[in-house]
C-alpha cells in the first residue's frame, strides 16, 4: 500500500468493562491485552501509535512496554470523543491528515486488516472508512449483536458505500449480508465535524454511533476483508485469544 496520508493510530482503553473486569490488563501469554493490541497496531506501520486511556495503571503498563500513551478524561460519552481529545493533545498543530481508531480489545487482529481500513481514504472520496465481512453463518444474519451494513458495491465488489447500518436483518431479498467491524479511519476534518454533532435520532434508536455521520450527510466507505477479528468481551473470548496467541496467530 502506497500511503499518502499522514496517519495517527489511536487505541482507546478503559477499565469500564462489567463482563470482564480490568479487561485491558488481562494476561494473554505473559503480556497484557492492551499491549498485544498496541504491538499489532504498530506492526501495521501506518505511523505513530498512541494508547488513549483514563487509567494511570494502563498508562504505566503501556509505556513500560515501549509504547506511547496519553491520559484522557474519564467522562467521555463515546469512544470518538476520547479519540478526538487524544488527537488534540497529541497533534494540536494539525499535522496528521487521518486518524485510525483501533479498539483496545482486539489482541489477535492482523496488522494487514488495520492497514486496509485506511484504503478508502487513500484512494477514494470517503470521509470515514471502516471494515466489513460477508456473513456466512446463518445465525449471524438474525443476531442483533451483529451489526449489518447496507451498502452499494464499489471497486469491483471489494468495497461498499455505506447507506445504513442496522441490527436488523438487512437488506431484504437474495444476496450477501455484511457484518460490520468497528474499526474506523477518519479524515481529520471528518472526525472534528463528527464529534461536534449531537447524537442523531437513528443513532439513538439503533444504538450505533456511525449513523450520526450518515444522517449528517457524511460518506462512509467499507473495505471488505475475509475474517472478523476476535473481540474480547467475555471470559470465553479471552480463553480463545490465549489459544490463538499461543499458536502464533
From Swiss-Prot:
UniProt keyword annotation of Transferase present: yes
The protein, known as: 3-deoxy-manno-octulosonate cytidylyltransferase
Pfam family, one: CTP_transf_3
GO CC annotations on file: cytosol
InterPro entries, per the entry: Cytidylyl_trans, KdsB, Nucleotide-diphossugar_trans
EC class name: transferase
One MF term in the entry's GO annotations: 3-deoxy-manno-octulosonate cytidylyltransferase activity
Alphabetic keyword roster: Cytoplasm, Lipopolysaccharide biosynthesis, Nucleotidyltransferase, Transferase
EC number: 2.7.7.38
Family of the protein in this entry: Belongs to the KdsB family.
Annotated pathway: Nucleotide-sugar biosynthesis; CMP-3-deoxy-D-manno-octulosonate biosynthesis; CMP-3-deoxy-D-manno-octulosonate from 3-deoxy-D-manno-octulosonate and CTP: step 1/1; Bacterial outer membrane biogenesis; lipopolysaccharide biosynthesis
Subcellular location field: Cytoplasm
Gene Ontology terms: biological process: CMP-keto-3-deoxy-D-manno-octulosonic acid biosynthetic process; lipopolysaccharide biosynthetic process
Protein's UniProt keywords contain ATP-binding: no
Catalytic activity: 3-deoxy-alpha-D-manno-oct-2-ulosonate + CTP = CMP-3-deoxy-beta-D-manno-octulosonate + diphosphate
Organism of origin: Brucella anthropi (strain ATCC 49188 / DSM 6882 / CCUG 24695 / JCM 21032 / LMG 3331 / NBRC 15819 / NCTC 12168 / Alc 37) (Ochrobactrum anthropi)
Top-rank taxon, per record: Bacteria
Described purpose of this protein according to its UniProt entry: Activates KDO (a required 8-carbon sugar) for incorporation into bacterial lipopolysaccharide in Gram-negative bacteria.
